[in-house]
Each structure stands twice: as C-alpha cells, then as structure tokens.
C-alpha cells in the first residue's frame, strides 16, 4: 500500500468514526468520504464534525457540499 493510499484510508476511517460517534450510520461516512475525495477535504470535514457536532444528517451533507464546492473553485 502506498503512502498516499494509506493516508486516504486513515482519513476515511477517521471521518466514518466521527460520523458514527454522532449517532449517524456508517454509510453516511462512506458517502461523505467518496464525495470529498481527498484526505485534506476529509480532515476539514472531521474538524467541522468535532467542533459543531451537528444533530441532523442534512447539516453534514450541507457542509460536505460546501467543502466540495470550495475545492472545485
């Protein structure tokens, strides 16, 4: 496994774990990781989850879309 692949896997795992800690299904974390697409974006999402602790899945999806939008610019 390359370093980049290992870094991606670690970021994905951390993101899924943070989402599960908040009471959301693992599938939401998997979908977020796929859409965010990079460890840097996933770490931004992890920071959001740890600081805001959103209560609704919609807030997680909104933040994911905002991060994706910023990356595309």
PLM features per residue range, with description:
Residues 44-73:
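Long, compositionally biased
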């Amino acid at each position: 496994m390359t370093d980049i692949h290992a870094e991606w896997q670690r970021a994905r795992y951390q993101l899924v774990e943070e989402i599960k800690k908040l009471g959301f299904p693992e599938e939401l974390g998997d979908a977020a990781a796929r859409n965010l697409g990079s460890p840097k974006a996933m770490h931004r999402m992890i920071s959001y989850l740890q600081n805001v602790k959103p209560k609704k899945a919609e807030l997680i999806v909104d933040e994911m879309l905002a991060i994706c939008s910023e990356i595309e610019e």
